[in-house]
Structures are given as structure tokens and as C-alpha cells.
């Protein structure tokens, strides 16, 4: 282990130990003042905004007498880090190991990670079969969002909404996300936020090659300035992408030997462009029931821009798949300016010889807020209703999320950007912006049940130009699918 990694690991262990010792709850200090009459009164202080430096866990002192918590997870490493790792000298692996030790010491429990399969779909299906059989094999599970959502209507997952140990107001939870995933209110079957490292890896973002940007547009930090000044719009992205194109081989045709501004697929990339621009396909009413709201003036206008990017911008390279097997090396080699992907691809860029930056997905209008769609390949944490340890699972989840927020997330940032996380650093501020704007939408989560309308993929796949006609052709099936999903939720207890 080199000195930098050793220093990080030692600092991490010491900080986690200190956090464990100070787990009696949040304390806001205040000075006392003495009046002329000799009476002392406490001076009222405004609570500081919670951040990664000052956050403390609010759990009471708990002792679960060494109880074992069985946690199911998918064995593929990208997903496994949610639950377990080995000390390898890698800052993220070591942070995960330190987190697990801290959770065990804090709550007096024994964490028992169990892998059934490396495959995320097989893992979700296995969990469902175990619950259906009434077997108490697992207390907690890290499962793929897209593959696990179907089983919530079967009543397989515990509702954490009123858990005595989880404080959903803390920044390590994405409360709105959890509420958006279900029908109704006061239902939290899926836990997500910093508890899931895969959630962080699944945040949509755009990498850019700083050296190439400087050679074309002079200022390599301009994308950061555009974001922070509120001017990072989809039209600006389209403009910069178009301007970056160059016919490198001089053959007069657009081919992969040329220089491009950006790349994207016709499916997953489309979803991140659409939802990142602030489009929402469904909206919850006052009772928490989702209603189809995709068709409006904003969506129609954005669809026109999306079509222009994919079919009228020679600087945009359409990728044949979501793995970007040819396009990622082109970005690394300085042949593509922007790489709209997910944060998880930072691992791929670790050995790039040139510097890269990272910005959020562009918004539609300057007046909009930035939005970061979480890819549905993220993991969510669920507790099987067959577990008899629901009294302690919430405490374990709260501790998991807290320690991730304090240490594992910053460790991943260090890997992602090759710099130590600092609140004063522009890249750290960008990551905080991406993290704080993370969301999902019910229509996105259940797009397959809504005839694919709410993913907007087919609009781009078919090369359609008239969004209104395309929408009308799918609206009836989407409404029927939405009604069916809503109906299935009515039979769920909790």
C-alpha cells in the first residue's frame, strides 16, 4: 500500500472510531449569557446545516447482543461493494471494510454477507422465492432496482416508513426518491441514498476531456463555470458537441476515425437526457397516486432538441449499446470531448493520461433546476417480511447509511476524480450538486409497465420527429398499464 492510501486508511479508521464513540445523538451547542440580575440564560443558536464534516449519528446507545444480520447481495464486484469488501489497499474497499467494523461495534451485531449469484436478476428472483416459501434466510438484501420492483406488490418487503431508528430527514437518505418509487404515502419498501454505493455509481453525469476542451474552446474549466452560473443547458451542450466535430482523416464522411463532441445510446442515454432536462413523465396527486403528465409544451419542445442532437448533429456519435465498448476508448484517447454516462465509469477512466472533468446533465432552460436521474441499475435495500429481526434492521440500515455518507462516499469521490474530497474544491462542489439533485420518477421506474412511453426511448429509436403523434400512439396502453400498477398496490399491507 503506498503512503497516500495508507494515510487515507488510517485516517478513515480513526474517524470512524471517533464517530462510534460519539453516537449518543445530535448535539447543538450554545453559549450562556449572564444578565445584570445574575441570571444565566442559554444563547439560542441556529443549527448548522449537516454536512459530511459535522454529521453525527442520532441512534441511541444500542446493544443487540451479537445478533447475526444476514445480508443478501449480488457477487459481481460493482454491486458487492454495497455490502462487503476485502482490505486491498484500494481506498473504497478499505472504506467499506471500516464501515462494516464500525456498524458491528456500534450496534453489537455480526454482519453476515451472503452471495447467491453474481447475477443481479438471479439474486432478486432468489430472494422472492425464499420469501414466497416463508423461509427466514435473510434479514436485509441489496437488490437491483429494476428487477426487485415487481415483487413489492406481492407484499414481500418490509415497510420502513415508521421505523423507530431511521431518520429519513438526514442527508444520507433520499426521502423523495423512496416515496416516488411507490403508490401512496407513508410507504418505504425500498431504502436508498448513501446506504447504497451503487446508487452513487448510478448517478447520471457527463465526463469531459479537459485537454481536448482547451484545444477547442480555450478554457478547460468553462463547463464548471457554465454549471455554476446556471447556463449549462441542453442547447449549450448541443452547441459544444457540434463545434467539437472534426473530419480527422479528411475523407469527407462522418465515421469513427473522426473527432466527435459526444456519444450516446438510443435507450439509457435518452432517459438521462430527458429526465436530466427536468422532464417528469408522471406526477403524484395529493393522495400519492401517480398520474401521467408527460405530454406538455416543455416535453414537446425538448423532444425537438433531442431529435436534432441524435439526427442533425454530426458531432454526436450514436452508440449501438449501453456498454459503450468502442466509444469509451475513443473518449480516453482524446477523440471524443464529452462522455455522457454514469459515475461508475470513473473506474474505467482511472488510468487516463489526460485530465478529465465531470459535470451534471444539462437542464432544459436556464430557469430550471439541475436534475440527476439515477440509473435503474442501482441497488436498493429491502428487508424480507419473513425476517424476525425487524426491530434491529432499521438501526443497521441507519448506521450503514451514516458511515457511507461520512467516509465511503468521499472515498469513492477520491477514486472518481483522482483527488481527495474537499468541500472547497470545484469538483467536490460539482459532485455535491450531482448527489443532491439525484432523483427518480415513478414513470421511469415502471416504464416497461407503461408500454415504454415514459422512457421516451422509442421516440429516438424510431427517429420520429412528431412527438405529439408518437405520444398519441402509445397513450392508451400507457394509461392502462399505469392503472394496473396502481391497482396492484392496493392489496399491499402497510
Enumerate the predicted regions with their spans:
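Short, solvent-exposed loop/beta-turn-alpha elements that line the ligand-binding surface or hinge
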Residues: 166-173, 227-229, 255, 279-299, ...
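Acidic, glycine-anchored loop motifs typical of Ca2+
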Residues: 247-258
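Extracytoplasmic/periplasmic substrate-recognition and gating elements
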Residues: 350-417
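Conserved N-terminal structural module of periplasmic/extracytoplasmic solute-binding proteins
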Residues: 2-154, 407, 464-494
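Glycine-centered hinge/linker elements that transmit conformational signals in sensory
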Residues: 238-243, 272-276, 280-321
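Periplasmic solute-binding protein
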Residues: 152-155, 175-224, 263-286, 376-382
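Conserved C-terminal helix/tail region of periplasmic/extracytoplasmic solute-binding proteins
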Residues: 385-394, 404-494
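Hinge/lid segment of periplasmic solute-binding proteins
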Residues: 49-67, 117-121, 145-203
Amino acid at each position: 500500500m503506498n503512503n497516500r492510501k495508507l494515510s487515507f486508511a488510517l485516517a478513515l479508521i480513526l474517524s470512524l472510531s471517533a464517530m462510534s464513540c460519539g453516537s449518543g445523538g445530535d448535539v447543538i451547542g450554545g453559549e450562556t449569557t449572564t444578565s445584570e440580575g445574575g441570571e444565566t440564560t442559554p444563547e439560542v443558536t441556529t443549527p448548522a446545516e449537516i454536512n459530511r464534516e459535522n454529521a453525527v449519528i442520532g441512534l441511541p446507545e444500542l446493544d443487540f447482543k451479537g445478533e447475526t444480520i444476514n445480508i443478501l447481495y449480488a457477487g459481481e464486484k460493482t454491486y458487492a461493494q454495497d455490502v462487503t469488501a476485502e482490505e486491498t489497499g484500494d481506498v473504497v474497499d478499505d472504506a467499506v471494510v471500516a464501515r462494516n467494523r464500525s456498524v458491528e461495534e456500534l450496534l453489537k451485531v455480526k454482519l453476515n454477507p451472503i452471495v447467491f449469484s453474481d447475477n443481479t436478476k438471479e439474486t432478486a428472483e432468489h430472494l422472492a422465492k425464499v420469501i414466497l416459501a416463508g423461509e427466514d434466510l435473510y434479514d436485509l438484501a441489496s437488490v437491483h432496482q429494476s428487477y426487485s420492483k415487481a415483487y413489492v406488490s406481492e407484499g414481500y418487503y418490509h415497510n420502513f416508513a415508521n421505523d423507530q431508528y431511521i431518520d429519513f430527514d438526514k442527508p444520507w437518505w433520499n426521502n423523495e426518491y423512496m416515496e416516488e418509487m411507490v403508490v401512496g404515502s407513508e410507504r418505504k419498501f425500498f431504502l436508498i441514498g448513501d446506504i447504497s454505493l451503487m446508487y452513487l455509481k448510478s448517478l447520471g453525469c457527463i465526463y469531459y476531456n479537459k485537454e481536448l476542451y482547451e484545444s477547442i474552446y480555450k478554457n478547460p474549466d468553462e463547463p464548471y463555470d457554465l454549471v455554476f452560473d446556471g447556463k449549462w443547458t441542453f442547447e449549450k451542450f448541443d452547441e459544444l458537441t457540434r463545434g467539437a466535430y472534426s473530419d480527422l482523416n479528411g475523407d469527407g464522411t462522418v465515421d469513427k476515425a473522426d473527432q466527435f463532441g459526444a456519444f450516446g445510446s438510443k435507450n439509457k442515454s435518452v432517459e438521462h437526457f430527458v429526465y436530466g432536462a427536468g422532464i417528469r413523465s408522471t406526477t403524484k396527486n395529493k393522495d400519492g397516486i401517480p398520474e401521467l403528465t408527460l405530454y406538455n409544451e416543455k416535453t414537446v419542445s425538448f423532444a425537438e432538441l433531442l431529435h436534432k442532437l441524435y439526427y442533425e448533429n454530426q458531432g454526436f456519435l450514436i452508440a449501438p449499446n449501453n456498454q459503450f465498448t468502442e466509444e469509451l476508448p475513443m473518449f480516453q484517447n482524446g477523440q471524443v470531448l464529452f462522455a455522457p454516462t454514469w459515475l461508475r465509469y470513473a473506474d474505467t477512466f482511472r488510468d487516463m493520461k489526460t485530465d478529465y472533468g465531470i459535470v451534471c446533465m444539462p437542464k432544459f432552460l436556464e430557469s430550471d433546476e439541475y436534475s440527476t436521474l439515477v440509473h435503474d441499475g442501482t441497488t436498493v435495500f429491502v428487508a424480507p417480511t419473513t425476517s424476525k429481526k425487524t426491530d434491529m434492521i432499521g438501526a443497521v440500515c441507519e448506521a450503514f447509511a451514516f458511515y457511507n455518507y461520512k467516509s465511503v462516499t468521499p472515498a469513492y469521490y477520491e477514486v472518481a476524480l483522482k483527488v481527495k474530497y474537499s468541500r472547497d474544491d470545484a469538483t467536490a462542489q460539482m459532485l455535491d450538486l450531482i448527489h443532491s439533485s439525484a432523483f427518480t420518477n415513478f414513470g421511469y421506474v415502471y416504464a416497461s409497465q407503461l408500454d415504454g412511453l415514459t422512457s421516451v426511448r422509442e421516440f429516438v429509436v424510431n427517429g420520429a420527429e412528431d412527438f405529439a403523434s408518437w405520444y398519441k400512439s402509445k397513450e392508451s396502453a400507457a394509461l392502462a398499464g399505469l392503472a394496473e400498477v396502481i391497482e396492484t398496490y392496493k392489496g399491499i399491507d402497510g
